[in-house]
């Protein structure tokens, strides 16, 4: 604040891996004088100028398994990518995040992340997660709120025109980066022997849409949609001008539109 107030025509860039921690330390004194940018892992649109269409196709499996953190994209072997992601999960997720809010139970945080990772794209409620983990609903909500603020996971609510229902219905949880998700469950196996390829594909594409929203300032809101008879659409994008529905499938099988 002192620098901005005292030095004319200066721009200060404050960055950090946690928006929560950064805003607590620098945000309030700079209200009205700052612009906030969300820097996610690389989007495919950012990577595209550096590779051919053929290379993009060849690298798709790596993106689904190892994700798109800048360091991961540039590392030259799967072994080094794996080691890097394990380091992030071990050193950052289970230490730095807990320190941000004075939390102490790293075991419960890890169990919650693993549960979310294994239920990728499935509807879950705070109550349900709490019962499975032996935690209170409020503790689960607090942990997931913190994980959202540090850009590890994000929640999609159900699309409904009743705003109360949008907030209270069970939601779906996704990871900003596939590599982090796979590191949490310790699975870097190739797609040919995995049972979760569809979930990885869905997580990857929805995250790409979220990244575009941040990077291009589109101002969209994101939901999923489901009827009482279990018909479902993976992603609903709402802007001030339009409503767009997207369904993501891995493979060539034709599906019926709900």
Regions found by a protein language model. Name each.
Residues 5, 72-78, 138, 151-154:
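AAA+ ATPase "lid" subdomain C-terminal helix
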Residues 4-28, 147:
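Sensor-1/coupling segment of RecA-like P-loop NTPase cores
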Residues 134-149:
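Short amphipathic alpha-helical interaction segments
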Residues 1:
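Conserved AAA+/SF3 P-loop NTPase catalytic/coupling segment centered on the Walker-B
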Residues 145-152, 157-258:
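A cross-kingdom feature that marks ATP-driven nucleic-acid transaction machinery
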Residues 127-131:
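A short acidic, leucine-rich amphipathic alpha-helix
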Residues 8-10, 31-35, 241-242:
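Short glycine-/polar-rich loops that comprise or flank the Walker A/P-loop
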Residues 17-125:
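Interdomain motor-coupling "hinge/lid" segment immediately C-terminal to the ATP-binding subdomain
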């Amino acid at each position: 604040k002192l620098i901005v107030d005292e030095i004319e025509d200066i721009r200060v860039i404050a960055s950090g891996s946690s928006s929560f921690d950064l805003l607590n330390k620098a945000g309030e004194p700079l209200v009205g004088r700052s612009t906030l940018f969300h820097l996610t892992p690389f989007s495919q649109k950012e990577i595209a100028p550096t590779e051919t269409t053929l290379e993009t196709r060849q690298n798709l499996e790596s993106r689904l398994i190892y994700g798109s953190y800048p360091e991961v994209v540039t590392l030259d072997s799967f072994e080094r990518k794996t080691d890097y992601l394990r380091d992030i999960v071990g050193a950052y997720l289970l230490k730095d995040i807990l320190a941000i809010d004075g939390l102490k139970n790293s075991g419960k945080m890890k169990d919650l992340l693993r549960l979310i990772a294994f239920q990728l794209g499935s509807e879950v409620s705070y109550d349900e997660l709490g019962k499975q983990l032996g935690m209170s609903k409020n503790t689960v909500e607090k942990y997931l709120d913190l994980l959202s603020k540090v850009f590890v996971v994000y929640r999609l609510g159900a699309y409904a025109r009743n705003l109360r229902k949008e907030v209270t219905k069970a939601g779906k949880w996704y990871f900003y980066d596939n590599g982090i998700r796979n590191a949490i469950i310790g699975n870097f196996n190739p797609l040919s022997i995995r049972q979760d390829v569809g979930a990885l594909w869905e997580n990857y594409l929805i995250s790409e849409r979220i990244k575009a929203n941040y990077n291009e300032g589109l101002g969209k809101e994101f939901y999923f949609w489901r009827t009482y008879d279990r018909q479902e659409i993976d992603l609903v994008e709402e802007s001030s001008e339009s409503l767009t529905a997207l369904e993501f499938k891995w493979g060539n099988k034709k599906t019926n539109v709900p």
